[in-house]
């Protein structure tokens, strides 16, 4: 259980961010629309959750169980938002791991749990991420993160992946106790940064995250990693690319050419 305790300690630690809803229109400067602030999702968008597959192979005999587990984590984060009560992401991850093991008739050892849950804090960045972040930073774009993970957990994740220095701030849904894609999660970032919500552009590899951001009033860009597709019944982002590097290039071009509103 050491891994679970470490994950939970990281999740419970850290400060809260300001909560609220930002209204108003996009900011302009010198008659032109100011570039949006880029809000990056973390798990699967920046960090490679697939790095946990060997641990699932060892624990379950099939590395593909990783996807079943992570889908369960996301499902029950939505249950916590829609039906309550709120539980932080690490607790849901641990509960989903227990559910997955029970459903498959597997008894997980403490070592198995440790490797999987501790592994969430040490995920590597996708190979295309660093170049993409550098491209946007070189263009003068402001970069922040928004994640379902708790504040201290994401700080560890970004530091361990070598990405922390790219971001001016990291935001967590813990501030509003409602998981993405709830509108409050995105709007709390705008409130904390002191900008209208349409001054934000989410970058994510999850269709549900893109839909949530667009419905909240943000712009969005979709990273169509292998196996990731947009939701056909939802609003569509103006930027889609096959990898983070390409999406970053498209974002720079789009934000440089935005006319005033």
Predicted regions and their residues:
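N-terminal secretory signal peptides and thylakoid transit peptides that target proteins
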Residues: 1-15
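Asp-based, Mg2+/Mn2+-dependent phosphohydrolase catalytic module
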Residues: 10, 134, 150-151, 155-261
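Boundary at the C-terminal end of the N-terminal hydrophobic targeting segment
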Residues: 24-28
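Active-site neighborhood of HAD-like aspartate-dependent phosphohydrolases
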Residues: 31-74
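Glycine-rich phosphate-binding loop signature in dinucleotide/nucleotide-binding domains
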Residues: 32-33, 139-141, 193-196
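An amphipathic alpha-helix signature
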Residues: 53, 66, 70, 90, ...
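A metal-dependent, Asp-based hydrolase signature
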Residues: 77-115
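Substrate-recognition element of Asp-dependent hydrolases with the DxDx(T/V) motif
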Residues: 112-124, 129-159, 171-173
């Amino acid at each position: 259980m050491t891994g679970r305790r470490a994950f939970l300690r990281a999740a419970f630690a850290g400060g809260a961010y300001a909560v609220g809803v930002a209204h108003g229109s996009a900011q302009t400067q010198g008659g032109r629309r100011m570039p949006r602030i880029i809000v990056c999702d973390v798990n699967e968008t920046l960090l490679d959750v697939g790095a946990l597959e060997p641990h699932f192979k060892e624990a379950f005999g099939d590395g593909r169980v990783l996807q079943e587990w992570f889908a369960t984590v996301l499902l029950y984060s939505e249950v916590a938002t829609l039906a309550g009560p709120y539980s932080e992401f690490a607790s849901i991850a641990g509960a989903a791991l227990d559910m997955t093991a029970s459903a498959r008739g597997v008894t997980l050892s403490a070592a198995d749990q440790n490797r999987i849950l501790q592994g969430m804090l040490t995920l590597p960045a996708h190979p295309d991420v660093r170049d993409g972040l550098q491209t946007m930073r070189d263009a003068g774009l402001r970069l922040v993160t928004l994640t379902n993970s708790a504040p201290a957990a994401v700080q560890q994740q970004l530091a361990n992946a070598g990405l922390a220095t790219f971001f001016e701030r990291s935001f967590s849904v813990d501030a509003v106790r409602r998981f993405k894609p709830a509108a409050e999660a995105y709007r709390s970032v705008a409130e904390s940064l002191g900008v209208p919500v349409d001054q934000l552009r989410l970058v994510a590899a999850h269709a549900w995250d893109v839909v949530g951001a667009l419905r909240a009033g943000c712009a969005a860009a979709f990273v169509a990693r292998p196996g990731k597709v947009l939701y056909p019944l939802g609003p569509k982002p103006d930027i889609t690319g096959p990898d983070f590097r390409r999406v970053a290039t498209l974002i720079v071009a789009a934000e440089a050419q935005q006319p005033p509103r």
